[in-house]
Amino acid sequence: MALLKGKQDQIIIPLAAELDADHGKLLTVRCEATIKRLPYDEAQDVFRAIQNRADNSGEPSDETLVSRYVLGWKMPGPDGTDVPFSDEALQEALQERGYRDALIEGVMTMLLGKKVMERLRQKN
């Protein structure tokens, strides 16, 4: 049991996967991911490893980060019902750029915090 109010081992982060659609349009799929929440020091270590990927043979890769920290999701399938979370479904999502980008952004939001991610978006 946590001593501090609001402390959680995992958090649900809303995502928006932007998928290429016909006629040059984008289809935005709203979904959410349950992400493992790390203690501050551990999150900083992971972020430093990401910054030093060139020195670490590309590790941790995006696939490693998503596989390690995404614990579940609420993701709509083609018929609108939720796709059950599984390793197979996760690997399929990682092969689609829009879902991949959304899941990576979710992991980065957990590592850096929502406010920092918002500031980074404003700069870009």
Where are the language model's segments positioned?
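Short, surface-exposed, charged amphipathic helix/loop patches that serve as local interaction elements
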Residues: 23-29, 37-124
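Short, solvent-exposed beta-strand/turn "edge" segments of beta-rich domains on protein surfaces
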Residues: 1-6
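Extended, alpha-helix-rich binding/interface surfaces that flank or overlap catalytic cores
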Residues: 32
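Short, hydrophobic/proline-enriched secondary-structure or compact coil segments at domain edges
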Residues: 8-18, 66-74
